[in-house]
């Protein structure tokens, strides 16, 4: 893997490529701060694009990013964190809003324990905690899941402990109902 890095240009940017020379992800921001006597670096107004085998893209933005080891394997995002997955036609498939999250670019994994809102073309789902596995194609709400779906003719509400959104099928599944830990749908 190769990482191209340039912090002297405006805006600051970095690009991660794989062994085949294809871009895995890009990260840019208004400013990169590297702290003396520390491995830590911070990015102000980060914008990250994770590419899925040249198909869809995940666009990730926040007000602040922290990389504790400056290796871009674990990036802590805070303040106004947004994830937007676009299809080949640049249509938003899923939009995730939260206050903080950790992105693991090489694993194509996103995690948070914060309150999260997920918007799809026909629903709005909220909950606490989230795991988004880009490679496997799912988004999982970890607790207090509540979904409101709507069509032209009606709306429907579903609540439970955990819910899973399949990015390929574009559908939600209730994993656990509240007050009934043995129920899996």
Question: Where are the model-predicted features located?
Answer:
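Mature-chain termini and adjacent capping regions
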Residues: 1-185
């Amino acid at each position: 893997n190769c990482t191209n890095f340039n912090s002297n240009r405006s805006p600051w940017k970095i690009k991660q490529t794989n062994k085949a020379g294809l871009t895995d992800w890009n990260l840019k921001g208004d400013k990169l701060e590297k702290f003396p006597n520390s491995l830590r670096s911070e990015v102000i107004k980060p914008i990250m694009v994770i590419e899925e085998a040249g198909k869809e893209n995940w666009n990730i933005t926040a007000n602040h990013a922290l990389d504790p080891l400056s290796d871009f394997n674990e990036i802590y995002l805070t303040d106004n964190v947004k994830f937007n997955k676009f299809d080949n036609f640049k249509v938003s498939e899923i939009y995730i809003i939260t206050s903080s999250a950790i992105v693991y670019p090489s694993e194509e994994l996103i995690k948070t324990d914060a309150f999260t809102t997920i918007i799809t073309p026909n629903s709005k789902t909220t909950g606490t905690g989230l795991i988004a596995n880009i490679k496997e194609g799912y988004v999982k709400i970890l607790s207090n899941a509540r979904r409101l779906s709507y069509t032209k003719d009606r709306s429907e509400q579903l609540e439970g402990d955990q819910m899973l959104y399949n990015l390929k099928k574009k559908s939600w599944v209730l994993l656990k109902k509240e007050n009934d830990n043995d129920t899996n749908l």
